[in-house]
């Protein structure tokens, strides 16, 4: 009985090479496939605006670029009150010698 159970386990187990041989068939690269996999930034922008109803309505009136900018534009998020940044004049400068003239 124990020898039969070992045979079944051997049949069910596939090595990594054997599994990859039938799971992924090699094919030549096709530039049309990459268009389906990766969306352009404009397409991602359009989809994000379509999902938010006010942005979609405004996009019909003034255009996608302006509508997206109004609702999802580059707005700085406010830091949390617990980790407030010091005022700019007291922050460490990235370029410490910026005040010297050469």
Curated annotation (Swiss-Prot):
Q: List the disulfide bonds.
A: 49-55
Residues with the modification 4-carboxyglutamate, per the entry, are: 43, 47, 50-51
Alphabetically list the UniProt keywords.
Chondrogenesis, Developmental protein, Differentiation, Disulfide bond, Gamma-carboxyglutamic acid, Osteogenesis, Phosphoprotein, Secreted
Tissue spec: Accounts for 35-40% of the total protein in the acid demineralization extract of calcified cartilage.
Q: Does the keyword Phosphoprotein apply?
A: yes
**GO process annotations (BP):** cartilage development; cell differentiation; ossification
Q: Which residues form the Gla domain?
A: 27-73
Q: How is it modified after translation?
A: Requires vitamin K-dependent gamma-carboxylation for its function.
Outline what the protein does.
Answer: Associates with the organic matrix of calcified cartilage.
PANTHER family the record matches: MATRIX GLA PROTEIN (PTHR10109:SF0)
- Name of the protein in its database record: Matrix Gla protein
